């Protein structure tokens, strides 16, 4: 679905991201140029458009005039040193042209309910391959999970087997052992945050917030 980098109303201008509507039924608004007193009226028109094209949830990125709107999630940065427990080290296989489709489907399935995680489309497969940082993690032929690294930044990680998160992470960290790693995670992804903290990662700052523009109950405002 087409995004709108510039979406003007009588009250200002925003960008509207619709690419997740077919998958998550979510739309995203980035306020560009709106006076604080006009934010509510501007968002009302943006939300109406998003709902018209099928969005059931509309989120708006952080803006000074959004304090009265309910917080959906915040995105925080975490940093830590890559270290490896040899007892948890498993086999890692890079994604190839033959397996990138499978990797992408697994990633989408595991991230479907994770806030701030983008759905990967078929057109993204070339980018995944060119990055050279997408992997499968196996143990004696059993798929444990997947991961995606960009240098020392963790772009994505997902366990396929229940309880395999530490094994997947230690195996991925073995690829950059000793380096300082960083990642971004939604505050609502509490299970992932607990895992990262167990591995020694610390929150180093809040990057931005998503507020809920629709649905919004009267009591929320």
Question: Where are each of the predicted segments found?
Answer:
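N-terminal charged segments
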Residues: 1-53, 112-123
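Conserved beta-hairpin
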Residues: 2-14, 130-147
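A short, internal acetyl-CoA/4′-phosphopantetheine-binding micro-motif in the GNAT/acyltransferase core
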Residues: 28-39, 152-165, 185-186
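Acyl-donor-binding surface of acyltransferase catalytic domains
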Residues: 31-91, 207-212
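Conserved acetyl-CoA-binding loop-helix of GNAT-fold acetyltransferases
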Residues: 36-48, 161-176, 193-198
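Conserved beta-strand-loop-alpha-helix junction that forms the acyl-donor binding cleft
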Residues: 56-65, 161, 182-193, 209-218
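Conserved active-site alpha-helix within GNAT-family acetyltransferase domains
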Residues: 63-74, 166, 188-206, 216
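Short amphipathic alpha-helix that is part of the acyltransferase structural core
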Residues: 86-118
